[in-house]
Amino acid sequence: ERWHPTKLRIGPDTLKTFSQKADQLIRLQENDLFFIDVGPIFEQHEGDYGQTYTVGSNSQFEELAAAARDIFIEVQGHWRAAGISGIELYKIAAHEAAKRGLELNTKMDGHRLGDFPHGLFHKGSLIDCSETPIQNVWVLEILLKDPKQNLGSFFEDILI
C-alpha cells in the first residue's frame, strides 16, 4: 500500500518536481543518474523516501547524487543541534547548495507525515513552517539543480 505513486526520474527528468509528468521516452543510459521516490504506508502510517542513484562511471553524476544526500545530512544535523524551524532548514539547504555551485529547487519543500492521510493534520509545507519540526513526522526534501550539467539530484527522508 502507498499514499503516493512511486516516481522514477531519469537524466534530464531529474530536474522535475513531484507533480510534473515524466517524459515517457527517456531511457536509462549506460552512464546516467536517476532517482526513485516512494511513499509507502506501514500499518496506516505514512512513510516517504527518495534517493538519487548512478549507473556507469561518471564522477560528476556521482558527486551530484551525493550532494543531495550530503546536504540533507548537514541540514538534519543543524535541526538536531539547534531545533530550528522549517524556514531556517531550507535557508541552510540553499546556502549549502550554493557552496557547491548548485541550486536548491524549493518547489520540493518538505511536508508532514502521519496517519493516512496526513492532509488531515497539516496542509502546509516544511519550508513555510515557523516552528521546529517534530521528529518522525516531517519529511525534508532536497532537490538540487546542477546548472552546468542541467541535471538534478534528489534526497528525502523523515527527520529523525
Listing of model-derived features with the role each one plays in the protein:
Residues 1-160:
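Active-site neighborhoods and metal-handling regions in enzymes and metal-associated proteins
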